[in-house]
Curated annotation (Swiss-Prot):
Annotated positions binding Zn(2+): 28, 212, 237, 241
Source organism (scientific name): Lactiplantibacillus plantarum (strain ATCC BAA-793 / NCIMB 8826 / WCFS1)
Catalysed conversion reaction: tRNA(Cys) + L-cysteine + ATP = L-cysteinyl-tRNA(Cys) + AMP + diphosphate
Motif 'KMSKS' region, residue numbers: 271-275
Annotated protein name in UniProt: Cysteine--tRNA ligase
Amino acid sequence: MLSVFNTLTRQKEPFKPITPGVVKMYVCGPTVYNYIHIGNARSAIAFDTIRRYFEYCGYHVDYVSNFTDVDDKLIKRAAEDHTTVPAVADRFIKAFMEDTTAVNIEPATVHPRASENIPEIIAFVQALIEKGYAYESAGDVYYRARKFKKYGQLSDQRIDDLEVGASQHTADEETDRKEDPIDFALWKAAKPGEISWESPWGAGRPGWHIECSVMSTKYLGDTFDIHGGGQDLEFPHHENEIAQSEAKTGKTFANYWLHNGFVTVGDDNEKMSKSLGNFVTVHDIIKTVDPQVLRFFMATTQYRRPIQYTQANLDEAANNLDKLRNAYRNLTFRLQDATNGTDTAVAEQLQTLITNFGTAMDDDFNVQNGVAAVYELAKLANVYAAKATVQKETLIALQKALVQLTGVFGVTFETANATLADDAIQALIDEREAARKAKDFAKADQIRDDLKVQGIMLEDTPQGVRFRKE
């Protein structure tokens, strides 16, 4: 049975979805004022991998991940760029979709935007006021944190020990508007020139935390299975989401809370920051790094563990990914001369590896042990493909397993940069072979070089010429 580490209880628990066969999952998305950095990518890749494993196990996954497109950072960026907040949001949502597509992250079932849910946000805030959990003060609306008796449970903190400014309101005049310094903002009164919407409390905009409470429950219901995000969101963001949502509905907000680990940069394990000059965006990385390598590097570290982003670790991931690609190519190549039938011994070994993969992943998505089973599968594939005689059904079974298991990590064996179809490549290989037999080596070399320019590498083997797409 699949078990997950629940941050709320600080222990592994058997995963039992609310609806059998269905997983309802919300993951906090980016604030869209810039290109996503590798910390954002780590969260997106980790939860995409978790989603893919659920799908591999046969679950239907309703996956919701938001865009925060109303925020102080967007307002600042719009002012710097002499444009509007919606224009900034549109630009970086487009960039987000391009970057996440490049690293093979599946789009969410729904990607809601805060700005498109203002009426629902206002209604949610009004309900909290009516229940006595929120109050208006000079156009702002604040949440009474102490009134929610479970406040601090997720982050394992006592409310008296919590930092002032959980709402990101720390200026003196803002603190003065609160009944209690620990209270946090649900609605912020508009400042001159800022984007705003009319509300019962005057013109303003939503606070950050209320956006996720509204959008998650709108699409997944008052109670859903999994809420995910980075460890940095555990407090105050997720703590505040629970307080808001459960105060309004009187129901458990999310049954399981999953948090991914941090990313450090360089051999010194430095925390990424603009001031240290080590701030790295996916947009820049994939200009020089194979997006599949970045994906594989991040997907094969267990989601709760920290990741050290270094060139050496990227190189190791590239080498391991290459081994998987080679195994797939070796199986594909041998299909052309395979005989009918099944090798029962290999079939048994394959089933053992598939079982080992599932056992590992069922243990809180232990991708390290899971990918170890995949590497063993690649070795088995290579050994079998090197035999003098191979059987078609066994090759297909090995190839299918390799595709399915690596697919959980987001690996694909398609090649986007090779423009020729396989039939056309084979025709050129045949032409090259004819030229070699005619001792026209100049022509044979020219065909090889022309193919290389298009990303197609030829390998001469005892079984004949094979090609691979770089």
